[in-house]
Amino acid sequence: CKSCDNSADGGSSSSNGDSNLSGTTGQLTAEGSSAQQKAMSVFSAKYSQAVPGAQFSYNSTGSGAGQKQFIAGQVNFGGSDSPLDDSQMAEAKDKTCKSDVWQLPMVIGPVAVAYKLDGVDSVALSPEVIAKIFKGEIKKWNDDAIKKLNDGVNLPDKDIKVIYRSDESGTSDNFQKFLKTSAPGQWDSEGKAFPSTTGSGANGSSGVVQEVGATDGAITYVEAGFAKEAKLKEAAIDFGQGPVELNKETVGNALDKLTYK
């Protein structure tokens, strides 16, 4: 999707369909998902190599902000972990040169339930337990519901400190969809704004991992790359048939079943 102004212009196309971008100049601007920030950094470097006369900038302000800026015509494209709905698509079309708006799946980023708990290397949690933690019904790491899923693990009598995204976030949207689907009856909230009834908010993916990394007993949800970079532990998820770790194999298995609407 492309807005009217502030775009990189120039260049030509050859008869075989390949683009000759050597003469392209200008600024390509984008804004949105902080979970996509690392991928966008790679895209930016590749774009600069392919189009040395143009500049590409990405502002990782969160999916909600990226959608709003794109719809308002302030950026050339928005990065979002949640798609635009029909009304947003219509509004964006009206404000972007009357052209159709394209939504292109470009980045896959698994969401981890990341935590810091000194002395505990691995924890398994069920979707129901995760939902109860994030709405404040389970408050201690040695709660019976957690102990039941972690036989033989010495869980401390320590407060659980929930850290959530304070900005409008596609990661929040997807995490809440997961809870609502996988823990029916335990989670009612939805959307890019996470309920602020329990815990403390932090801005962006970098913000939540920074808070968790500095707080023993803390837990959050975040794109797995940020959790790994911050050296946070990632909970295995138990859907009733044993804990499933987040790794390349399990992510690959999930992607094999992925469908696009």
Regions found by a protein language model. Give the residues of each.
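Extracytoplasmic ligand-binding site segments that recognize negatively charged/polar headgroups
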Residues: 110-114, 120-210
